[in-house]
Amino acid sequence: MRVVLLGPPGAGKGTQAQKLAEKLGIPQISTGELFRKNIQDGTKLGIEAKRYLDAGDLVPSDLTNQLVDDRLDQPDTAAGFILDGYPRSVEQAKALHEMLRRRDTDIDAVLEFRVSQDELLQRLKGRGRADDTDEVILNRMKVYRDETAPLLEFYDTEVKTVDAIGTLDEVFARALQALGK
């Protein structure tokens, strides 16, 4: 099963992606984690990505697309994957579609985790990430609204909305139900 998770920063995509990947026996592909690892390792891509992430901006699509394309070449993705944090724009969604077309496959499901803005601010301030300052949080929410929300229109009929308020297990149960599992 090939699944895309959508939702604003702090909606719980990463946590739910881990649980879904475990339950479905497929890898979680998190561009955020891949960027953080590259930043920590001081790679050229990591240094370049850090400049954008520190400002609360999205890493340019060409860098992100290459990272995802390379990851999809790994054998553990053959049976499927959970994409967490990608695609973030219609341009990236089209690139993903092309990557999958080259592999004779497609996305099976798109889950949108929905949370109110007040709840998101509370969650993000409580995570303790160095990059989660008020200014960066508000900019990331604006970037999400401006650039990522149009994905809901792009994926249209494939999108299943998941209410992301509640316990981890409650949200997980809703996500599984949305996937028909």
From Swiss-Prot:
Q: What keywords sit in the KW lines?
A: ATP-binding, Cytoplasm, Kinase, Nucleotide biosynthesis, Nucleotide-binding, Transferase
Q: Cite the annotated pathway.
A: Purine metabolism; AMP biosynthesis via salvage pathway; AMP from ADP: step 1/1
Q: Which CDD domains match?
A: ADK
Cite the GO molecular-function annotations of the record.
adenylate kinase activity; ATP binding
Spans annotated as NMP: 30-59
EC number(s): the record gives 2.7.4.3
Subcellular location, in the record's words?
Answer: Cytoplasm
Identify the stretch(es) annotated as LID: 126-132
Subunit description = Monomer.
| Protein name as catalogued | Adenylate kinase
In its UniProt entry, the species of origin is given as: Mycobacterium marinum (strain ATCC BAA-535 / M)
